[in-house]
């Protein structure tokens, strides 16, 4: 068998394949056996019909077609291995030449177009320079953390006054379009200033007391009329404020392992300082990755983006009722998917150059961490990803994280005040990031990996 690669674009190739008759013949012989088991000829047992009679009954052309269809994927896979290309999508195959049915020789020729991982040239990434915010925690950070802790133990009390920022309301809302009611809800709980409901809600309810209402214009975000302009009437049924427990030694004993408020504040200060270091590390990591993408040109196949785009909405990430399936959202998903693809290609190339490996313990640690983020039992989570064939994807993700950590370890990082930043607490000795913040591929989006198509999934099918 001969194969040759024709580069169509940086991310798409045409694989021209020639299969000589001697390599085609085993598939033809197998096709005769298959056809023989499917037809009945008087005087012959099923499966024992001679080839000449099969040619007379169904035609040698049908046998050749069966042989080609059965063997095509194997020849394509062999050509992929021989050429060294790394497919990203299913191939589009066109048969360009078949043996003459009236002859006993002649080869097969076909062309397969497929998207492939682009080849890139890595820059000198040692010593990349980035600047991050200074990691300074203050008494204000401690006060904020203490107030948040007090809030967990707070109680709600009805008040007879206008609603203010931070208050908790019980509300009824009714939406109308052109004077016709299109949606309504009663007894909703809402915190003023949360910004989690409708645009304009906070402004409308601020200053309202119980049994008062207001009307405001907004854009609906859910239901059959998502994205449409509407008038919304909001009626306040109750106004409540949260009473926080007094910050004293008794509260420290109630809310923590400490006996005194001073000990609790000291621990909160330590947590705030550690949090600032992690934030600094995450910022450095993201900026290093941004710099890598700036330095390397990575072409993105349209098919990869569109495939992930459709998967995103098909799997319900558009929230089921189409409320978020807007062109603006689609453009956001396209951009995120393209960026995730670029990140993957760059980090995979760095991992290959740095000969980054993933140990079993590193994979287990990552699975346990990911399981906790989903609130799942690690063993159950591991079983699910194993059954769904996602273990290789997990290995790739850990490998990329380690590759980025290698670059991060070589980067020159300073804060906004010109001080050198020590990231040793952020990067593990083995080269893996300590912080479990966002995935380095930033594929929020789900979007899945834009990696090579497994051999069993890239079956070649000829065009009709």
From Swiss-Prot:
**Does this UniProt record's set of keywords contain Cytoplasm?**
yes
The record's keywords, sorted A to Z, are:
Cell cycle, Cell division, Chaperone, Cytoplasm, Isomerase, Rotamase
Keyword check for Ribonucleoprotein: no
SUPFAM superfamilies referenced in this protein's UniProt entry, alphabetically: FKBP-like (SSF54534), Triger factor/SurA peptide-binding domain-like (SSF109998), Trigger factor ribosome-binding domain (SSF102735)
GO CC, one annotated term = cytoplasm
| One function term, GO molecular function aspect | peptidyl-prolyl cis-trans isomerase activity
Family matches, as InterPro entries: PPIase_dom_sf, PPIase_FKBP_dom, Trig_fac, Trigger_fac_C, Trigger_fac_C_sf, Trigger_fac_ribosome-bd_bac, Trigger_fac_ribosome-bd_sf, Trigger_fact/SurA_dom_sf
Region annotation Disordered: where it falls in the sequence: 426-464
For the biological process aspect of GO, one term held by this record is: protein transport
Where is it mainly found? cytoplasm
Regions that span the bilayer: none
Q: Can you say where in the cell this protein is located?
A: Cytoplasm
- According to the UniProt entry, what is the EC number of this protein? 5.2.1.8
Q: Which reaction does it catalyse?
A: [protein]-peptidylproline (omega=180) = [protein]-peptidylproline (omega=0)
- Sequence ranges assigned to domain PPIase FKBP-type in this UniProt record: 166-245
Q: Please note every region of biased composition (Acidic residues).
A: 432-455
Alphabetized PANTHER family for the sequence: TRIGGER FACTOR CHAPERONE AND PEPTIDYL-PROLYL CIS/TRANS ISOMERASE, TRIGGER FACTOR-LIKE PROTEIN TIG, CHLOROPLASTIC
**What's the family?**
Belongs to the FKBP-type PPIase family. Tig subfamily.
Role played: Involved in protein export. Acts as a chaperone by maintaining the newly synthesized protein in an open conformation. Functions as a peptidyl-prolyl cis-trans isomerase.
Q: Which HAMAP family does this one have?
A: Trigger_factor_Tig
Q: What is known of its domains?
A: Consists of 3 domains; the N-terminus binds the ribosome, the middle domain has PPIase activity, while the C-terminus has intrinsic chaperone activity on its own.
What protein name does the entry list?
Trigger factor
Its gene?
tig
């Amino acid at each position: 068998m001969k194969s040759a690669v024709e580069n169509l674009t940086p991310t798409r190739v045409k694989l021209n394949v020639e299969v000589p008759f001697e390599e085609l013949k085993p598939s033809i012989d197998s096709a005769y056996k298959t056809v023989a088991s499917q037809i009945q000829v008087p005087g012959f047992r099923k499966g024992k019909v001679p080839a000449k009679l099969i040619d007379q009954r169904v035609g040698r052309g049908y046998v050749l077609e069966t042989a080609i269809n059965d063997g095509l994927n194997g020849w394509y896979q062999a050509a992929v291995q021989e050429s060294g290309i790394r497919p990203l999508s299913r191939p589009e195959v066109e048969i360009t030449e078949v043996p003459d049915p009236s002859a006993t020789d002649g080869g097969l020729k076909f062309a397969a177009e497929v998207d492939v991982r682009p080849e890139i040239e890595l820059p000198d990434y040692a010593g990349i320079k980035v600047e991050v915010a200074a990691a300074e925690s203050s008494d204000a950070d401690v006060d904020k953390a203490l107030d948040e802790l007090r809030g967990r133990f707070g109680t709600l009390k009805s008040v007879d006054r206008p609603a203010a920022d931070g208050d908790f309301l019980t509300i009824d809302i009714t939406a109308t379009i052109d004077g016709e009611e299109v949606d309504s809800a009663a007894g909703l709980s809402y915190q003023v200033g949360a910004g989690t409901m409708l645009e304009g809600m906070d402004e409308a309810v601020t200053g309202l007391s119980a049994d008062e209402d207001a009307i405001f214009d907004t854009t609906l975000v859910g239901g059959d009329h998502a994205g449409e302009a509407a008038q919304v009437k909001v009626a306040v049924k109750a106004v409540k404020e949260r009473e926080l427990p007094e910050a004293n030694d008794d509260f420290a004993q109630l809310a923590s392992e400490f006996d005194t408020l001073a000990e609790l504040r000291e621990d909160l200060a330590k947590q705030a300082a550690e949090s600032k270091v992690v934030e600094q590390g995450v910022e450095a990591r993201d900026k290093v990755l941004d710099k890598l993408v700036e330095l390397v040109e990575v072409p993105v196949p349209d098919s990869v983006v569109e495939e992930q785009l459709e998967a995103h909405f098909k799997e319900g990430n558009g929230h089921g009722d189409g409320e978020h399936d807007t062109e603006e959202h689609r453009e956001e998903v396209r951009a995120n998917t393209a960026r995730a693809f670029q990140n993957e290609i760059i980090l995979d190339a760095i991992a290959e150059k740095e000969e980054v490996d993933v140990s079993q313990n590193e994979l287990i640690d990552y699975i346990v961490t990911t399981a906790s983020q989903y609130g799942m039992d690690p063993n159950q989570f591991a079983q699910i990803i194993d059954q769904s064939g996602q273990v290789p994807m997990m290995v790739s993700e850990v490998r990329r994280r380690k590759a980025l950590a290698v670059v991060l370890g070589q980067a020159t990082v300073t804060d906004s005040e010109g001080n050198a930043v020590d990231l040793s607490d952020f990067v593990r000795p083995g080269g893996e990031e300590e912080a479990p913040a966002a995935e380095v591929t930033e594929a929020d989006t789900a979007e899945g990996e834009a990696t090579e198509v497994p051999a069993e999934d890239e079956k070649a099918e000829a065009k009709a």
